[in-house]
Regions:
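Short, small-residue-rich loop/turn micro-motifs
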Residues: 47, 121, 183, 295, ...
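Hydrophobic "anchor" residues on beta-strands that sit immediately upstream
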Residues: 118, 437, 490-491
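Phosphate/pyrophosphate-binding active-site segments
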Residues: 2-4, 22, 180-181, 192-197, ...
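N-terminal cationic-hydrophobic initiation segments that often serve targeting/anchoring roles
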Residues: 83, 169, 284, 429, ...
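Active-site diphosphate/adenylate-binding microenvironment
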Residues: 28-31, 36-41, 46-58, 400-480, ...
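Thiamine diphosphate
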Residues: 20, 128-135, 322, 373, ...
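N-terminal alpha/beta PP-like core and its mobile active-site loop of ThDP/TPP-dependent enzymes
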Residues: 2-7, 17, 21-212, 216-390, ...
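Short, solvent-exposed loop/helix junctions and linker helices
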Residues: 25, 155, 249, 418, ...
């Protein structure tokens, strides 16, 4: 009888091949059924040979549309964006080896933005691993390094593996789960250290208990899927919250005491508060309490209202308002969104989170702050019941934001024949309807696009916030157009970011998506150029590209393309694009010299000191330097 490495395995035993194919079809049907049951309606990917073709086929049989992308990271970003917009798990299919490796950046984005994505990959079958090294990677370890968890699904009980993957992805804090499909895996003995899987607590504690083996791997069996835990699986140093309303009040006692004493509180709204939009609006509207939003939380409080005070990123545009406050309260703030700058405000900082993992990270980032693990709904009720004592003037949030945005708009003027990034964003915003969804790539232009693009509803402004990856905007725009049909979609990207996903323009053409791609084209990695020292950092060769016509490339790929160099031309081309049945790429010539002033205003000293020396509308003199926080 031939063993695992014997002739039958090496040359392909027909009976084994038939069994393996049957296991592949069963596993594919199981994962599609679990996704469909959780509300997933689209699947993205770049398939290879092997079981993932069965997954694509099972999706089609179940009425789940498959969207072919040009790159695995782009496909994963599409899946993550659909998860962001719909709440259902995103689904992406990749092949083994290079396919999964190429998806890593997209998986990392989903991990740091806490988005539930099921990444379905082939793997070298266990019975071939002793002999086959072609495309053989330790995919469990690879998944563990960037995802919330990694599963290896064998033929014994694929339904259990599929259900587990979906539950893990959705359990707070949400995140991606890699499922390695191995229909040929034989039963192996289980070992100790297997975590006990159970439903996540309503408070958002870790989705499973127990300790994974030190190596982070577990053998595959016919009875249970192999599981490895990744960096976002849960844990942290803070205890889980007590159950019940009385316990919630106990956990929030420090917040209640701080609110009673505060005269000038400021709220920081993070993505955790997106599940409580109605309650937050009811509590804050008319309260006079300014509310700063993280990137992912934009729209919880409408920008057209009096309370929305702009962005909080850890930069300096928010500094005047926070420096004038006497209490800073964060609701659902995720430190992954904050840039690595010092947090040294004099006001006490209190962060409320529903998961101990996020709270543990918060207490490390917000120096001197207090992190509370408690239901956000209870915290919102507490804020509503403790109105502030009138230390802020009327509409302080609106006034603060208006002043900051006015300074940003006027930070720099473009040279004749070129556009400033401010010109681009304000023109596009002025000529698009309120329900437009904007996606923003990482790069210097995001420092302008994120604050200047105002929204009145959540999920209308999307960015890779935790990972801040380039190459996000176009795949995210594709997903937004598919997952929210009817809403206009605009992608803001730089020449660097578009270069990473250029062929996805063909995807928009093939799918006939009305997506407008606006390229900030200065042939430069402008954000990196600003950070370069005059010597020792590689000079122009490290940050400069040869000028390219993205409008011409778009036309070659079947999209409409237009080059613009002034606001009037941009407005005209935008109007045509919004009425076109298909995608448009607008190639905007940008003056890169304008970014230096933008960087200083948003990340440097200029943001700390408004021209008047006072916070607009507060009447409070601002300190001239940051003070160490006295919070505990």
């Amino acid at each position: 009888m031939a063993g695992p490495g014997g002739p039958a395995a090496q040359h392909g035993d027909p009976q084994h091949r038939d069994s393996q194919h049957g296991g592949s079809r069963r596993g594919a049907a199981a994962i599609v059924a679990a996704l469909a049951g959780a509300g997933t309606r689209l699947m993205f990917g770049v398939p290879g040979g092997g079981p993932n073709l069965d997954v694509v086929g099972a999706a089609a049989a179940a009425g789940m549309s498959f969207v072919l992308a040009h790159g695995e990271t782009a496909a994963t970003i599409m899946a993550a964006t659909c998860a962001d917009l719909t709440g259902a798990p995103g689904a992406v299919v990749v092949t083994r080896g290079p396919g999964l490796a190429s998806a890593v950046n997209g998986i990392a984005h989903a991990t740091l933005d806490r988005l539930p994505v099921i990444v379905i990959a082939d793997t070298v079958p266990a019975h071939q691993r002793d002999r086959v090294s072609h495309q053989r990677l330790d995919q469990a370890a690879l998944g563990r390094s960037v995802a919330k968890a990694a599963l290896t699904a064998g033929p014994g009980q694929p339904e259990q593996a599929a259900d587990l993957a979906v539950r893990l992805a959705l359990a707070a804090p949400a995140g991606p789960v890699v499922v390695n499909m191995d229909p040929g895996t034989r039963a192996m003995p289980a070992t100790s250290g297997a975590p006990a899987i159970g439903p996540a607590a309503s408070t958002g504690t870790a989705p499973f208990t127990g300790t994974a083996p030190a190596t982070g791997t577990m053998p595959v069996t016919d009875d249970a899927p192999a599981l490895t835990r990744g960096p976002a699986a849960g844990g942290g140093t803070l205890p889980a919250p007590r159950a019940g309303a009385d316990a919630a009040g106990h956990e929030l006692a420090p917040l209640a005491a701080a609110l009673r004493a505060a005269r000038r509180p400021v709220l920081l709204l993070g993505p955790g508060a997106l599940a409580h939009v109605a309650a937050v609006r009811e509590a804050l509207t008319g309260s006079g309490i300014p509310a700063l939003h993280t990137d992912r939380a934009r729209g919880i409080m409408p920008d057209s209202g009096d309370e929305a005070a702009g962005l909080v990123t850890g930069g300096t545009m928010e500094w005047p308002l926070l420096a004038a406050s006497d209490l800073i309260v964060g609701l659902g703030v995720d430190p992954a969104e904050m840039i690595p700058a010092a947090w040294d405000y004099a006001a006490r900082t209190i962060l409320v989170s529903e998961t101990s993992a996020v709270a543990a990270e918060a207490v490390r980032y917000f120096t001197g702050g207090t992190a509370l693990v408690a239901p956000l709904g209870a915290a919102i009720e507490l804020i509503a019941a403790h109105p502030h004592h009138g230390g802020w003037p009327p509409a302080a949030g609106r006034t603060a934001k208006a002043g900051a945005l006015a300074r940003l708009r006027e930070a720099a003027r473009a040279a004749p024949g070129l556009l400033s990034p401010q010109d681009v964003v304000t023109t596009v915003r002025a000529h698009t309807p309120p329900e437009t969804i904007a996606t923003v790539d990482a790069g210097a232009h995001m420092l302008v696009a994120m604050p200047l693009w105002e929204v009145d509803e959540p999920h209308r402004l999307l960015i890779s916030s935790g990972l801040a990856t380039m190459g996000y905007a176009l795949p995210a725009a594709i997903a937004a157009a598919l997952c929210t049909p009817g809403a206009p979609v605009v992608a803001f990207t730089g020449d660097g970011g578009l270069g990473m996903t250029l062929m996805e323009i063909e995807t928009t053409v093939r799918l006939r998506l009305r997506v407008v791609v606006v390229v900030f084209n200065d042939a430069t990695l402008s954000l990196i150029k600003i950070k370069q020292r005059p010597a020792g950092h590689g000079g122009p060769a490290a940050v400069g590209y040869r000028p390219a016509s993205f409008a011409a490339v778009a036309t070659a790929l079947g999209a409409a393309g237009a080059a613009v160099s002034d606001a009037a031309g941009l407005a005209s081309e935008l109007a045509a694009a919004l009425n076109r049945d298909g995608p448009t790429v607008i190639d905007a010539s940008i003056d890169p010299a304008t970014y230096t002033a933008v960087m200083d205003l948003t990340r440097g000293e200029a943001g700390r000191h408004p021209p008047t020396g006072h916070h607009p509308g507060t009447g409070h003199h601002l300190p001239t330097a940051r003070h160490a926080s006295t919070g505990t």
